[in-house]
Curated annotation (Swiss-Prot):
UniProt-recorded name of the protein: Alanine racemase
Species name: Cupriavidus necator (strain ATCC 17699 / DSM 428 / KCTC 22496 / NCIMB 10442 / H16 / Stanier 337) (Ralstonia eutropha)
Keywords tagged on the record: Isomerase, Pyridoxal phosphate
Name of the coding gene: alr
Enzyme Commission (EC) number: 5.1.1.1
Active site annotation, chain numbering: 35 (proton acceptor), 253 (proton acceptor)
Amino acid sequence: MPRPIHAVIHQPALANNLDIIRGKAPESRIWAVVKANAYGHGIRRVFAALRGADGFGLLDLNEAVLLRDLGWQGPILLLEGFFQPQDVAVIEQYRLTTAIHCDEQLRMLESARAKGPLAIQLKLNTGMNRLGFHPAAYRTAWERARAMPCVGSIVHMTHFSDADSARGVAHQIEAFDAATANLPGEASLSNSAAVLWHPQAHRAWVRPGIILYGASPTGRDADIAGTGLQPAMSLHSELISVQDLQPGDTVGYGSLFTAERPMRIGVVACGYADGYPRHASGWGEQRAPVLVDGVRTELVGRVSMDMLCVDLTPCPKARVGSPVTLWGQGLPIDEVAQASGTVGYELMCALAPRVPTSVATITASDSAAPAVA
């Protein structure tokens, strides 16, 4: 028998989250962002649930080709554009939309001799200072793109740096509107946080990412409470050992946890080689939460490569074989991430290939049935 650890990708949750996003931005078309292999969920696993989107956004040409192989005929956006002149031929062959964010990409496009018409999204740097043309150079970049015979539609695009914070998006919208004034073309501004909290930024296209998968753009689950968003990934395992500790006994490498009273702990078949964060806290004031037999408890000690330990005080009936939820439905991934000094995005993307993953599928009655993927 294999180790009991396994992950589940919940297609009904993905479809639910897409519906909620549609309700938040009813006048906008949706790029479902599936970069990083759908934030670790797997493009193959999420495709059926997200094909109601208007397009898919990603980074990798191979992932774009995979979507075409899965039967997707709609738009696919390369969010970082292309990296070599020869990529333009692949973009043309597979009918991809590409971002253009720098002079080098414009030069490559000019020299590629594509037949077109190519759909491009010209990226404006409104303050993120990562990718995009500065406002003073944007109109010139647009005119260069417009003059290329291979270029068809041009969408104006930017990315928000503070849509999930008190600073907000007003300053970036102002810069965007000033730089694109009197230029024809649709606009795409909103990331997940702007979809939820800044309707003035929705425009023609929105680009939700993390909220498709049921986690919070801020890293705080409380911030999406009441939205109806559901976690699309659950990570489960079982107890493989139970230990009885006496006061003064320590747990794990570095002896970071010391028992202050007689207590039982459980050993879970999950470690950092499975994608669980080694820096998850099992000592001090904020210990990482875990569910054992559906009961909330906490980590004790340091996470090892293949195992971690949990306090069984709240779970007196727990024994070897008791089910454990590391994150997912019933335990928000953002809570685990907060206790690990990171964000839910990272935990999703870090799920290790060695973890068997199944799919809870969408059936005709909208009920979930597990299927291995």
